[in-house]
C-alpha cells in the first residue's frame, strides 16, 4: 500500500485524492506518474518526520522526473530535510540546485538566507566578527532576492535588512 494512502492527516488525504484524480485525467507518461507517486510519498514521510524514507522517495522521484520545474520542488524538499538535520552546507547545495531549475522559488532564497544568518550568529559567538559580517551580507542578498519575488512577505527579514542598513 502506498504510504500516502495510510497517512491519517486530512490535508494529506485531500491532496492525495485530488492528485490521483488529476493523474487520471491529465495526459502523463507512466514515468511522470511514478515520479509524482514517489514525490507524494516523500512529502508524506517528510511531514511525519521520517526523513530517511522521505529522502529515498525524493531521490527516486529525481531519477524519474524529467521536468525541470517539478525537479526544482523535489530538490527544494531535499534541502528542507538537510536543513532540519542541521546539514546546512548540503541544504544550501540543494537550494542552489532547485533555483537553477526554477529561479522563482522565494522560499529557497529565504531558507538560504536563514542558514547564512544562523552561520553569522554562530561566527559572532565564536568571536569572529569578520566572518559573521560576510555571512550576514550573504543572508541580506538572499533575502533581497526573496523579497523581490514576493513583496510584502518575509517581514522580519525586511525589518532586519532596514535595521542593519542592508536594505537598498
From Swiss-Prot:
| RNA-binding found in the keyword field | no
Tell me the PROSITE patterns matching this sequence.
TPR (PS50005), TPR_REGION (PS50293)
**Main localization of the protein described in the UniProt heading:** plastid
Q: What is its subcellular localisation?
A: Plastid membrane
Extract the SUPFAM superfamilies matched here.
TPR-like
Q: What is this protein called?
A: Photosystem I assembly protein Ycf3
Pfam families in the cross-refs: TPR_1
Q: Which GO terms describe its cellular component?
A: plastid membrane; thylakoid membrane
Tell me the InterPro entries matching this sequence. PSI_Ycf3_assembly, TPR-like_helical_dom_sf, TPR_rpt, Ycf3/AcsC/BcsC/TPR_MFPF
Disulphide bond pairs: none
What ranges cover the TPR repeats? 35-68, 72-105, 120-153
Protein family per UniProt: Belongs to the Ycf3 family.
Q: Give UniProt keywords alphabetically.
A: Membrane, Photosynthesis, Plastid, Repeat, TPR repeat
Q: What is its biological role? A: Essential for the assembly of the photosystem I (PSI) complex. May act as a chaperone-like factor to guide the assembly of the PSI subunits.
Look up and give the membrane topology term: Peripheral membrane protein
GO biological process: one example? photosynthesis
